[in-house]
Curated annotation (Swiss-Prot):
Sorted UniProt keywords: Exopolysaccharide synthesis, Transferase
Gene name of the record: wcwK
The keyword Transferase is annotated on this UniProt entry: yes
Superkingdom assignment: Bacteria
Additional record remark: Stealth proteins are part of a protein family that is conserved from bacteria to higher eukaryotes. Family members were first identified in microbes as proteins that help pathogens to elude the host innate immune system. Microbial stealth proteins are involved in the biosynthesis of exopolysaccharides. Stealth proteins are predicted to function as hexose-1-phosphoryltransferases.
Entry protein name: Capsular polysaccharide phosphotransferase WcwK
Molecular function as annotated in GO: transferase activity, transferring phosphorus-containing groups
Organism expressing this protein natively: Streptococcus pneumoniae
Length: 329
């Protein structure tokens, strides 16, 4: 029996003039523009399909916590009984506000008192692609995660954050006891060739990286509180950054912690796909086949014709979800 599961979705209206003006006031020359470029705040205008997908494919969800600076989509019905509007100021300590960092917004989610112990964190570009069961996310009230060790090979500036995670994880879990004591959670048919990563990891000490699934992430509220208790100084420093920084950590740290404390159940590799917006043909194929539970459509530097690509994807979603959800006016 799975306890109540809440969804949490974060959203920013990058076109809001009030938000943009406040952002400008706090912008500083940090020399790392790729971490805070405009594509991070560009609106694909697909968010209504996120709600349509939830209503159709996950009607069992307890509540949806909509995290916002203060703005709301014009079409959103804020009076829906399952929808909880939460402003940053409602749960993030005032010394961290205003914030323009998704890491700060996510690292403090455990402070939302009404949020259930089991919750699933979405960004607004991660869509439920087919029918979703509670057991796809939690089993025995534990989050289902990919327990695959994969070497971190830095290729972009954002990878500093993953390196920061490994510094913490190796400080606490250098011996990988969970791997040695619960091998059945690290070796299974569903991992295919990725089992080799875990096999090789037996022969060396320390953790050199994890294989990440860019999908909606199941979390335990208590894990956030535990890490804040153990690494409060570090997290406080991260949360004082107004913008994302190479010295940050993010909510993936909580997932890794759950793996190393054996507070998880294995997830399948086919749980989701991460596809750049520019690869619209692949997006169409994944939506049509419905083999993956989640689809992350990422607007990144590969998107050359933003308007055309978004319009193409919107037509696909409109065909799949033609009816308004009850979350829409």
């Amino acid at each position: 029996m799975v306890n109540n599961i809440d969804f949490v979705v974060t959203w920013v209206n990058g076109n809001d003039p009030v938000w943009r003006e406040e952002k400008k006031k706090y912008e500083v020359l940090d020399g790392r523009p790729t971490l805070n470029d405009e594509t991070r705040y560009r609106d694909m205008d697909l968010f209504q399909y996120w709600f349509r997908a939830v209503e159709k494919h996950a009607p069992w969800v307890n509540n949806i916590y909509f995290i916002t600076y203060g703005h709301l989509p014009e079409w959103l019905d804020a009076n829906h009984p399952k929808l909880k509007i939460v402003k940053h100021e409602d749960y993030i300590p005032k010394e961290y506000l205003p914030t323009f960092s998704s890491n700060v917004i996510e690292l403090n989610l455990f402070r939302i008192k009404e949020l259930s112990e089991q919750f699933v964190l979405f960004s607004d570009d991660v869509f439920i692609n087919t029918f979703l069961k509670e057991e796809d996310l939690f089993k025995n009230n534990l989050p289902r995660l990919l327990s695959i060790y994969r070497p971190l090979i830095p290729t972009k500036e954002f990878d500093y954050i993953n390196f920061n995670h490994l510094l913490i994880m190796n400080r606490y879990f250098h011996d990988k006891k969970t791997l040695s004591q619960h091998k059945g959670k690290f070796f299974n048919v569903g991992y295919g060739k990725f089992n080799l990563y875990n096999l090789f990891s037996i022969f060396y000490s320390g953790i050199i990286g994890y294989h990440d699934a860019h999908v909606a992430m199941p979390h335990l509220k208590s894990t956030f509180a535990e890490i804040w208790n153990k690494e409060g100084v570090l997290l406080d420093r991260v949360c004082k950054n107004k913008f994302r920084s190479t010295k940050d950590v993010n909510h993936w740290l909580m997932s890794y912690w759950n793996i190393e404390t054996n507070s998880f159940m294995p997830q399948t590799l086919r749980v989701g796909e991460y596809v750049p917006l520019a690869y619209s043909g692949k997006i169409e194929s994944i939506i049509h086949k419905q083999k993956n539970k989640f689809l992350c459509i990422n607007d990144d530097e590969h998107t050359e014709n933003f308007i055309n690509e978004v319009n193409f994807v919107r037509k696909i979603f409109e065909k799949k979800f033609p009816e308004k959800s009850k979350f829409e006016k």
